[in-house]
């Protein structure tokens, strides 16, 4: 089993609506991936019959997406491909209405963002314009803590003339300046010309760009790397550190009821370790129970580590008691406690008016989606230096950064960014867009009351509500 040895990394694919994300993503999965060849042949045949032959890679992705949305499989294995060094999981294939929202909840899971920009005339400009998605996606990726970025300049076969060196250099210059402005160090961001459709520089170096000498990056820990393809760029990402020594935090993505097994919550271990036999507490339900088994890709695991997307079976818990957005933690080691309120540094990205105390948008934090009130605007700060410009401002508007005290409208489990990064960043959504992003500085936790403890948890010897 090659998978056992290779570390897993998660990537998120971002970029403007027609940049070719689906085709490029489809291509990678198709050529290096976990899709069974028979399945591909079936998809191809269907694509031909429906006159979608030219769309084959994107079509593969659409089929997978449809299956995922209809809940036919809980099998994330399809969204995988391997490089020499890593097993890569694509966490969210774009094109979703809620892509930005998923990106906020999902990006906390991404080790690397692959930003795809279209090089054809007009398309690049549209994506990078003031309200283009390229900008918003890149800024979100950085704010939400995605350490690595790779930029693929796509549709290079579609430039004037095709495979134009001048056009690539023009885009490379602009995109490097932009990722720098967002906060990335351009020295660590490979920018490469590709065709997701024809496959140029995706997996093998392109025969069509003799001018292209390759990308070069320099990482702090691993030094200089060069290469020509997207596959090599992914292969050279520094291995992300996994916070397995911290206490367990596992935000639930879904909860399934599986015949003959019972209730199976599914989510990704963000910090700590999940093992069978452990007694977990679900917050904010304040319910403790024993973990019977842990599975990943249909194989049972002795333990799940940060980065693992797993399902785990819990005893005596009804599917009605737990839901997406709750957090599982170890009842004996700094268990998660509901937040009464929390203080956060918030950057207002695009809000048409003024935001005053009392504003109540929806926050997306890890997998939770909950309305929270901006209870007090404490300080307005300079985005660059972090210095306080004004205390107790009357209002904030687009472009401002502020320290704000927030109160959730119902039970919500969040943590400070410094302790548990994935549970300490959020997006503020209103009017179907991302109005702001924030990082949690400190959390005022509710006083723990004795929660419900299932029989299996009592057997495993838990004192309810015993919190530090």
UniProtKB/Swiss-Prot annotation:
Q: Which GO terms describe its molecular function?
A: GTP binding; GTPase activity; translation elongation factor activity
Locate the region G2: 71-75
Looking up Gene3D superfamilies in the UniProt record yields:
P-loop containing nucleotide triphosphate hydrolases (3.40.50.300), Translation factors (2.40.30.10)
Instruction: Tell me which residues bind GTP.
Output: 15-22, 92-96, 154-157
State whether keyword Protein biosynthesis applies: yes
| Keyword Manganese attached | no
G5: where is this region?
195-197
> Which residues lie within the region annotated G3?
92-95
Which InterPro entries does the annotation name? EFTu-like_2, G_TR_CS, GTP-eEF1A_C, P-loop_NTPase, T_Tr_GTP-bd_dom, TRAFAC_GTPase_members, Transl_B-barrel_sf, Transl_elong_EF1A/Init_IF2_C
In the record, the note on similarity to other proteins reads: Belongs to the TRAFAC class translation factor GTPase superfamily. Classic translation factor GTPase family. EF-Tu/EF-1A subfamily.
Its recorded name reads: Elongation factor 1-alpha
Q: Which organism is it from?
A: Hydra vulgaris
Lineage of the native species? Eukaryota, Metazoa, Cnidaria, Hydrozoa, Hydroidolina
